[in-house]
Amino acid sequence: MIIVLSPAKSLDYETPPHVRKHTIPDFVDDAAELIGGLRRLSPQQIASLMDISDQLAHLNFQRYAEWSPKFGTHNAKQAVLAFNGDVYEGFNAKTLSSADLDYAQNHVRVLSGLYGLLRPLDLLQPYRLEMGTRFANPRGKDLYAFWGERITQALNAQLKKNAVASRVLVNCASGEYFKSVKPKLLEAPIITPVFEDWKGGRYKIISFHAKRARGLMARYAVENRIDRPEQLKDFDADGYAFDAEASNDSTYVFRRRVVE
């Protein structure tokens, strides 16, 4: 079983990693090709392309200039320790043991606009390049065209290392990022957990809570060494509970009702 997550815009390179083990991303050459194109953009063009502030544009202009195809602890940090958004607040990798991270290395993947597909301990140099960015490149008009079938093929290769009964992809990524996966070419069923909160008289997805819950779900799977999707139904972190009536074979709905 593999769980896929979205990356985070916010990054933490200040906190020292609590583990030394690291790996190198599989798609460094592809990332270098994208960096080459990004380096041709001015800060103003970056701001326009990504719809970000001038300050952020200048920061990323500098990041692209400093990016190197040679990865080391001097210029990079393990992906799940560097990402610092809502999902990673839930996953909370800095409190996972070395054994937990070793398990995650084989069962968790992070989709990335620049790096394609990352393992948790893959070294990550700071960047910003969301998957939905319409960045024209030699392979097409956007990053979905750039990555094509590569991400799906890499997922298939990893899934084949699992026992047949455990060959399932659990989609804990956003729609923007999961669009980079080709379901028709994926050699495994897909299960998507959905997290809903009671608000305004009905259950609905609240973005901040749903993102955090995706990270909590990934952590739950890692800590409990879950390898079959049925086991995910026991997830109960932060007050969520599986709702069988609202779920089906491909969508697992978890709901919680907090007093308003």
UniProtKB/Swiss-Prot annotation:
Q: Which parts form a coiled-coil structure per UniProt?
A: none
For this entry, list what GO says about its biological process.
response to hydroperoxide
The record's section on InterPro entries has: YaaA
Give a GO cellular-component term: cytosol
Q: List the disulfide bonds.
A: none
**Which family does the UniProt entry place this protein in?**
Belongs to the UPF0246 family.
Protein name per UniProt? UPF0246 protein Bphyt_1375
Q: What is the lineage of its organism?
A: Bacteria, Pseudomonadati, Pseudomonadota, Betaproteobacteria, Burkholderiales
